[in-house]
């Protein structure tokens, strides 16, 4: 059971990681060459990063310039707010170096996803989930090394219907940008969970 999974392929090997919540070590890593048989090969972090407290959710792989990035959600020790951190390694199964928070925005910033467009890196996230206002899926340009925000965050989509959007993925194909995201309630006999596209 790997909630909030993220998968990448490097050469002929697939790597998957996902939410570990409060369980240490943090963010398990599994590998496969056929997408059927998987073997756990380690974790992103053996110990929690210095700035974090709990709620280790939704890690997102990204491979850029021969470097493996993982953007992850965790609660910050100093204020108990969920933010997005980033760590890098030369390999998905190698030792990751944590670079601390990359998105510290409002009362919640979760569910990172990376888009590369015309050589520039962008990060998207869910915001305002704990505020008395509609959730928004926000984005911002990243520095070329992928470790810091640059420029002003901008809105991708606003949840005016209050459907609980989160877990967004965005990509570009044939000149169009697509945003895929989860809405409605998850789990149980009355679940109305759905996936939407914009």
Show where each model-derived region lies:
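Carbohydrate-active catalytic/glycan-binding domains of CAZyme proteins
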Residues: 1-198
């Amino acid at each position: 059971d790997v909630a909030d999974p993220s998968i990448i392929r490097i050469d002929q090997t697939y790597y998957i990681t996902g939410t570990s919540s409060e369980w240490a070590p943090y963010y398990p890593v599994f590998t496969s060459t056929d997408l059927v048989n998987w073997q756990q090969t380690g974790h992103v972090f053996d110990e929690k990063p210095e700035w974090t407290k709990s709620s280790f959710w939704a890690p997102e792989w990204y491979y850029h310039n021969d470097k493996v990035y993982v953007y992850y959600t965790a609660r910050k020790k100093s204020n108990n707010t969920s933010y997005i951190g980033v760590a890098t390694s030369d390999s998905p199964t190698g030792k990751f170096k944590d670079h601390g928070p990359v998105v510290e925005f409002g009362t919640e910033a979760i569910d990172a996803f990376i888009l590369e467009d015309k050589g520039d890196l962008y990060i998207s996230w869910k915001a305002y989930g704990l505020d008395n206002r509609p959730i928004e899926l926000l984005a911002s340009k990243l520095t070329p090394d992928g470790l810091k925000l640059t420029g002003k965050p901008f809105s991708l989509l606003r949840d005016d219907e209050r459907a609980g959007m989160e877990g967004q993925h965005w990509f570009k194909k044939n000149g169009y940008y697509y945003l895929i995201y989860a809405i409605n309630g998850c789990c149980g006999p009355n679940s109305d969970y759905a996936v939407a596209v914009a």
